[in-house]
Amino acid sequence: MTQPKALAFDVGGSVFDWKTSIHSAVKKLAAGKNLPIDHEAFAMAWRLQFFVQIKRVHDNAIPHVNADVLVQAALEVVLTEFSGLEVSDQERQGLLSAWHQMKSFEDFPPALERLKEKYKVYVLTVLSFSMVADSSKVSGITWDGIISCEFLSAYKQRPEAYLEGCAVMGLKPEEVAMVAVHPSDLNSASKTGMKMCYAEPQLQEPDVPGLSMPPEYDNYFAWGKGFKELADKLCGINA
């Protein structure tokens, strides 16, 4: 199998720990209001509703807006689910800022630095450009490029997102490996000709109909239990 020239990283849940960031924001809100709020349930509901909003974009039910607009719409739905929870504009902004302050998983930055010696490293994400730029700065990591689906004609996991993302990189799909913890993301990328690299997830995601599925290890170009192991294999493969 030919070697990829570039790696395209999913980041939400793969590289960045969205859950801990939202937990912190919800705990701060709960402390300020002196209310018991189930931060785990809130975070999972918000993440799930984010995917619901993306599906609405896929279905042409709403315009192709960026993830900041989508997570705000998702938040409004979640707030109605937590009856009796009223938030001010300032508190709402405090919650939304969590998506711009996500930290990377601990094993990722050193793995990324090693991978940069062998490959171009890009982000290909449903998150907004500013979410990724801000969270990358928080985590002290840099990329060769950030490709947000807000600039493409479709969101992942539509094929257009992967094809257009590769075109932005100036590469053919078969020259790029998608890196993610979500098997459905990898499968969708593979259908366009991209290679698949899998890292086992470090947090639990909500069960999203049509998106949640088990990994298919035999079909992956490389996989690891974490990013260190994945980087070991990718650097060895390309040696």
Q: Residue ranges of each PLM-predicted region?
A:
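Active-site neighborhood of HAD-like aspartate-dependent phosphohydrolases
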Residues: 1-48
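Asp-based, Mg2+/Mn2+-dependent phosphohydrolase catalytic module
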Residues: 1-4, 113, 124-239
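Hydrophobic alpha-helical core bundles mediating ligand binding, dimerization, or RNAP-core interactions
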Residues: 22-30, 46-50, 71, 95-99, ...
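Alpha-helical elements of Rossmann-like donor-binding domains used by nucleotide-donor carbohydrate transfer enzymes
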Residues: 24-28, 45, 73-77, 94, ...
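A metal-dependent, Asp-based hydrolase signature
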Residues: 34, 40-43, 47-93
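A generic structural motif
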Residues: 35, 117-120, 194
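Short, acidic loop-to-helix structural element flanking the phosphoryl-transfer center
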Residues: 64-72, 85-123, 159
